[in-house]
Amino acid sequence: INLKPTTGSMPPRLRIAINETEVFDGVIDQPKSIRHETESQDRLNITIHKTGKTKDVVDSKEPQEVLVDEVLLNGLSQHPDKFGVFNQTNNSYVKDQTTEGNEMALNGSWSFDVPVFRQEFVPELDRTQRDQFTDIGTACFGCSFTYGTFLDDNQTWPYHLGDAKNYGVGGNSISAIVGTAHWYVQNFKCDRLVMLLPHVCRLQLHDQHKGSWTFIPFLGDKFEGEAKEKVKDIVMFGEPSLLFSGYATRMKELLVEINEKTDLYITSYQPDTYDMLDKTMNGVCKILPFYEMSAEFEMASDNEHPGTEHNRIFANQIRPILGG
């Protein structure tokens, strides 16, 4: 938590709790960062009680404000300006009221409660893919952009690499892709492994009736029980960094293990995802250039997925980097 006060001669007192554990109780008169480590939980809850805005301070017209400048989980922003709520209470001259945001100008309590989107990275081995798992020079993992939806096999980017197998699965999430790739390197050999990853908002969910499946926002699917609540959270708190922060650490651990078995390369066709990978996975494995989908070239027949020329250009771009 990064805090920035603006105060006069009488600074405020703050009492801060993270998931009901008190982490700070004292006066704040200069910028302060508070770091707290805790076991993974399903939600991140922060409460900040602010006092000290006495009638004398109000009458002096001196400022006594605190800005919750940033809240980070695993190094990624949780957007306190969008999801914070301040309940101002016990103030001279003004009524109690609630405001949204990350500013505390009066006495009161600031609260912040967001879901933590953890992922289990379960391998999904029963999905439709172009090739059967086997030893190969280059193993390619991804979603429909790798599988080549609405394209023939020889129009996909893995085909253009040569000596490569296409293990892309339409509609896959990052966690399904990474989980399956992790399983693959435990059971097969490859000289290098390439992942083309989708948006971070695709999450692998579990249902006792459906098993493991991927939620893709705005497709209009119907959900029940726990999955319904998870989907509601994804829609309400859909900031990429907030979504990714819940599973980035576990993903990094799995990528390290994959990279110990083979040369690992990752990239994305989604700008948000590519930005998250660049911020969190540099040094863990090699990050390939962004997959561009230029309007200059014809799309697949559904006019949503990339066409053969997009794939050929991407393969030509990364082939010298992959070597072999």
Show the residue positions of the predicted features.
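Short strand-turn-strand beta-turns centered on an Asx-Gly dipeptide
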Residues: 17-22, 73-75
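Activation corresponds to long, low-complexity, non-globular regions
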Residues: 77-120
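Short beta-strand/loop motifs in extracellular/secreted proteins, especially
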Residues: 10-14, 42-44, 67-69
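Extracellular carbohydrate recognition and processing domains
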Residues: 21-39, 87-92
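A short beta-strand element within beta-rich, extracytoplasmic domains
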Residues: 1-8, 45-51, 55-60
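Alpha-helical cap/lid subdomain in secreted, periplasmic
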Residues: 182-324
